[in-house]
Structure formats: C-alpha cells, structure tokens
Amino acid sequence: MGFFDFLKKASAPATPAEPTFPLTLAADAKGTVVAMENIPDEVFAQGILGKCCGIEPTEGKVFAPVDGEITQAPDSGHALGIMGVGGVEVLIHVGVDTVEMKGDGFSPKVKEGDKVKKGDLLLEMDLDKIAAAGHPAVVITVVTNTDDFKGVEVVASGDVEPGADLIKVSK
C-alpha cells in the first residue's frame, strides 16, 4: 500500500443505492391522465403489454418517468424503452398508430444506451402534426414487466404536471 493510496479510495465513486420500494414513476407529460381502459388502443386498454395509463398532452414534451437507461429508441421517434432503477421496465408510447408517421413530428433527444434521470427531456412532438395525421396523441406509460412486481398502481388522476406521481410500483 502506497502512501497516497488512501486518496484513491476516498475519490472512488460511490455505488448508487438500491431504490426503495414502493418506487414511483413520474408523469412524463403535462396533461390529463387517461385510465388504462380508456386508452384508444385495445393492446394498451386491455393491459396486454402491462399495467399502464395515458396522459392526453397539452404540451409537446415527454420527460423521463424514472432514472434508468434507454433500451429502445426506434427511428420513428414515437416510442422509447427504459430499464429503470429497481428493474422496472418502462415503455413510453406516444400516440396511437403514430408509427405510421415515420418520425415526422417527433424529435428524440436521447438514443439507445443513454443514461437518463427522472425529469430529463426525452423527446419533443408536434401535437398539431399528430392531430393532422388523424392520430390520438395520448402519451402511454407502461410497466412492461408488471408481473415481476407485487403491485403496479396508477396513483394520479385529472390534470398532472411532469414529475408528479403517476404510477406506484411495489415489490
């Protein structure tokens, strides 16, 4: 052990603490919460991909609902996958059938492999273009590995701001 080794140990980065459960996913858009069964797409409304809810956006920005890493970022820009802290797998899907827009109206701010923090801007969308294309713009947040958890519960209703509590995940 060298004389200055204690300095190296002191400056080593701290290991991030494991998240405590229940873990709360934040609202990823400004707007009005849409219950899962009212999402205008049967795959989401029936919970086939996992428990979810939507937000009918009033602004064209989508933010990270959880700390994690971007695992999916298709070129179309209409969806993102995040491996969140605590093993929570999140799919953010912007709009219904918006994949048909082939990226027009979507401006992703992240790419696959990027680390994100809750509240980081993930993408911008042109709500007018989405409406003109005839698609609902609802921002859908899905916990795709719902079955890995004891509970996944939507805790918000009415109007929400980005960062407000949206979904509670219990282990």
Predicted segments, located by residue:
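Contiguous, well-folded functional domains in the mature portion of proteins
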Residues: 2-171
